[in-house]
């Protein structure tokens, strides 16, 4: 008996389409939460780790940790949880077994508290202007300086302040202002006594009526004969500012040069026997091509400070000046050439066309009565259209009046963010052999952990 399988087919299957259910929508992906920047203890621990890495990269011993005032070490685990670890009590004993107070241990603990205090000051300034502090280490490095430079720029932008630069480039202005803020942080926390992150000093110049060099000695008047390329910046400035002392002649190779004969040049007393443009190993590197213009520039800054601060007792005897440029700001190694910022008097020819009777502001009259200004440049500047020089150089350039404005803005930023007056403490300049002009730099090796070179 055979079994047949019977399949029933609906009559409507061939004439009508079976309705198909719409496809289900794929499940929506959950939006990822934006990675939040570390805050509070997490931020401080992260900065401490970066500072420790920077110390290790420089080859300096030690490490930076975050510690509470109860001697608890603060750390963050892999999941981002804050961990407080009580400090272990260590007893330091001498040979007889009696406990001794370790001075070094106390100093180290005090330094940890001061570092934490300095970090709090720095974060107050940076967080007020939403500045990314991921590269902040509180060491005089590019990462730390960049953070404070951004804070200065943000303050100028948000306050809608218009800063007029006189013989100053904006890059140098922000650079010096950042150095000043870092100096305030270090000084406020008393983190590193004797360290001057600002690179600025107060100089008792003594140039009220005669020129003095950095040695504190009178400068010597010396005739100068200089030949410059016609297309160089210095030659064009000499033709414009001193047409009676310059002329275009042909040198011994038949090339047209600008010959500048100057009888009012002044040099350091250590360079009397040196030919023009050369310095001895005992020189401070100061040289003025126009002595009367230099005296006028000193009188300008004296009158300007007196107009800004009438009650300032040393306004006419001291001035603030940057001692180091970008080349040697964060380095203790000597440079080939000048070790201090080059001081050059610049004349303000356009000030002669302003009627003094229409001006009653004493700060403006200081410049109108003395149309010259001190400008601080790179220690060993290299000008355009000049031959390459072996010295390390940068484009550092800031005038004496803009340096005053730079300090004023840094004080405003500190007062508005921290809420107290900044610790304005600049060391007074005294001559030292480390400031001498270096004619030769001995070769130096680089760090290498290998026992043999090859």
Swiss-Prot record:
Enumerate the subcellular locations listed in this protein's record, separating them with semicolons. Host nucleus
Q: Which residues bind Zn(2+) 2?
A: 325, 327, 378, 394
Q: Which organism is it from?
A: Canine adenovirus serotype 1 (strain RI261)
Renumbered residue ranges of the record's region Disordered: 1-41
Question: Gene that codes for this?
Answer: DBP
GO MF terms on file? DNA binding; zinc ion binding
Residues involved in Zn(2+) 1 binding: 213, 215, 268, 284
* Chief place of localization: host cell
Q: InterPro entries given for it?
A: Ad_DBP_C_sf, ADBP_zn-bd_sf, Adenovirus_DNA-bd_a, Adenovirus_DNA-bd_N_sf, Adenovirus_DNA-bd_zn-bd, ADV_DNB2
The record's note on its domains: The C-terminal arm bridges DBP molecules together, thereby creating a chain.
Q: Which UniProt keywords apply?
A: DNA replication, DNA-binding, Early protein, Host nucleus, Host-virus interaction, Metal-binding, Phosphoprotein, Viral DNA replication, Zinc
Specify the superkingdom: Viruses
Query: Which residues are annotated with the PTM Phosphotyrosine?
Result: 129
Family according to the record:
Belongs to the adenoviridae E2A DNA-binding protein family.
Protein known as: DNA-binding protein
Q: Is Transcription regulation given among the entry's keywords?
A: no
What does the function comment of this entry state? Plays a role in the elongation phase of viral strand displacement replication by unwinding the template in an ATP-independent fashion, employing its capacity to form multimers. Also enhances the rate of initiation. Released from template upon second strand synthesis. Assembles in complex with viral pTP, viral pol, host NFIA and host POU2F1/OCT1 on viral origin of replication. Covers the whole ssDNA genome during synthesis. The complementary strand synthesis induces its relese from DNA template. May inhibit cellular transcription mediated by the interaction between host SRCAP and CBP.
Q: Where is this region: Flexible loop?
A: 226-260
Xref: Pfam families:
Viral_DNA_bi (PF02236), Viral_DNA_Zn_bi (PF03728)
Location of the region described as C-terminal arm, DBP binding in the Swiss-Prot/TrEMBL record: 440-454
Q: How does it assemble?
A: Homomultimerizes on viral ssDNA bound to pTP. Forms a initiation complex with viral polymerase, pTP and hosts NFIA and POU2F1/OCT1. Interacts with host SRCAP.
Task: Please give the biological process terms from Gene Ontology that the record holds.
Answer: DNA replication; DNA-templated transcription; positive regulation of DNA replication; viral DNA strand displacement replication
User: Looking at the UniProt record for this protein, which Gene Ontology cellular component terms does it annotate, in alphabetical order?
Assistant: host cell nucleus; viral capsid
């Amino acid at each position: 008996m055979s079994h047949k399988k019977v399949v029933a087919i609906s009559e409507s299957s061939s004439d009508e389409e079976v309705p198909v259910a719409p496809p289900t929508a794929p499940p929506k992906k959950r939006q990822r939460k934006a990675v939040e920047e570390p805050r509070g203890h997490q931020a401080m621990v992260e900065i401490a780790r970066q500072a420790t890495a920077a110390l290790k990269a420089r080859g300096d011993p030690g490490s930076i940790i975050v510690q509470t005032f109860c001697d608890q070490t603060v750390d963050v685990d892999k999941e981002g949880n804050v961990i407080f670890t009580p400090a272990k009590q260590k007893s330091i004993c001498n040979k007889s077994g009696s406990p001794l107070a370790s001075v070094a241990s106390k100093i180290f603990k005090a330094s940890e508290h001061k570092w934490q205090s300095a970090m709090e000051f720095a974060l107050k300034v940076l967080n007020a202007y939403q500045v990314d502090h991921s590269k902040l280490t509180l060491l005089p490095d590019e990462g730390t300086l960049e953070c404070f430079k951004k804070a200065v720029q943000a303050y100028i932008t948000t306050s809608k302040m218009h800063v007029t630069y006189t013989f100053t480039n904006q890059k140098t202005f922000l650079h010096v202002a950042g150095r000043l803020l870092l100096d305030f942080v270090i000084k406020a926390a008393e983190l590193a006594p004797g360290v001057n992150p600002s690179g600025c000093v107060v100089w008792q110049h003594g140039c009220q009526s005669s020129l003095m060099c950095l040695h504190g000695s009178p400068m010597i008047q010396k005739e100068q004969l200089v030949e410059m390329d016609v297309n160089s910046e210095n030659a064009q400035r000499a033709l414009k500012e001193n047409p009676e002392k310059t002329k275009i002649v042909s040198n011994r190779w038949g090339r047209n040069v600008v010959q500048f004969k100057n009888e009012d040049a002044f040099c350091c007393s250590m360079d009397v026997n040196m030919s023009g443009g050369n310095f001895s190993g005992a020189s401070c590197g100061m040289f003025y091509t126009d002595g009367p213009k230099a005296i006028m520039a000193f009188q300008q800054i004296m009158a300007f400070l007196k107009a800004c601060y009438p009650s300032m007792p040393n306004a006419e005897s001291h001035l603030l000046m940057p001692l180091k440029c970008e080349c040697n700001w964060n380095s203790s190694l000597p440079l080939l050439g000048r070790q201090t910022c080059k001081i050059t008097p610049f004349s303000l020819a356009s000030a002669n066309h302003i009627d003094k009777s229409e001006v009653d502001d004493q700060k403006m009259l200081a410049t109108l009565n003395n149309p010259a200004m001190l400008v601080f440049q790179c220690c060993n500047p290299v000008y355009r259209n000049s031959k390459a020089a072996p010295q390390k150089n940068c484009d550092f350039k800031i005038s004496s009046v803009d340096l005053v404005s730079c300090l004023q803005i840094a004080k405003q930023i500190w007062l508005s963010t921290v809420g107290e007056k900044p610790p304005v403490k600049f060391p007074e300049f005294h001559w030292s052999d480390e400031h001498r002009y270096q004619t030769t730099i001995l070769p130096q090796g680089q760090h290498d952990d290998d026992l043999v070179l090859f």
